[in-house]
């Protein structure tokens, strides 16, 4: 009748206000979700998108957090959760003809990676 209160041991890393559209970052995140740490590194190294480098650094940071804070080895972790959330827009104006201003919206996003040890 009692519930098992085992807490998952997970390491997390997040990048906030990353200057990229959420859809462009999701295109990369969807490829690595549920994969092991080593598979994700190999995939990100050879994908041709600009978001890959930042996500590669984020995965390395999550693995370092797992190693340092939780004592997990770098051999077994896998990406249990990877999400991209939209953030605020940087709003700018581009000067146009006859004194008008044309709005420029520069999107940002929050990227969160959660890793757990595969048993």
From Swiss-Prot:
PROSITE patterns: RIBOSOMAL_L22. InterPro entries: Ribosomal_uL22, Ribosomal_uL22_bac/chlpt-type, Ribosomal_uL22_bac/org-type, Ribosomal_uL22_CS, Ribosomal_uL22_sf. Keywords: Chloroplast, Plastid, Ribonucleoprotein, Ribosomal protein, RNA-binding, rRNA-binding. One of its GO terms (molecular function) is rRNA binding. It is found in: Plastid, Chloroplast. GO terms for biological process: translation. One of its GO terms (cellular component) is chloroplast. The keyword 4Fe-4S does not apply. Belongs to the universal ribosomal protein uL22 family. HAMAP family: Ribosomal_uL22_B. This protein binds specifically to 23S rRNA. Part of the 50S ribosomal subunit. This is Large ribosomal subunit protein uL22c. The gene is rpl22.
């Amino acid at each position: 009748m009692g519930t098992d209160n085992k807490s998952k041991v997970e390491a997390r890393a997040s990048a906030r206000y990353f200057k990229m559209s959420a859809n462009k970052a999701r295109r990369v995140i969807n490829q690595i979700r549920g994969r092991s740490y080593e598979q994700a590194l190999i995939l990100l190294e050879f994908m041709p998108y600009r978001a890959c480098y930042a996500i590669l650094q984020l995965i390395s940071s999550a693995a370092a957090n797992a190693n340092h804070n939780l004592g997990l080895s770098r051999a077994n972790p896998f990406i249990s959760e990877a999400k991209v959330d939209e953030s605020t827009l940087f709003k700018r104006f581009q000067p146009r003809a006859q004194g008008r201003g044309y709005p420029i919206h520069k999107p940002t996003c929050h990227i969160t990676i959660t890793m757990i040890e595969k048993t």
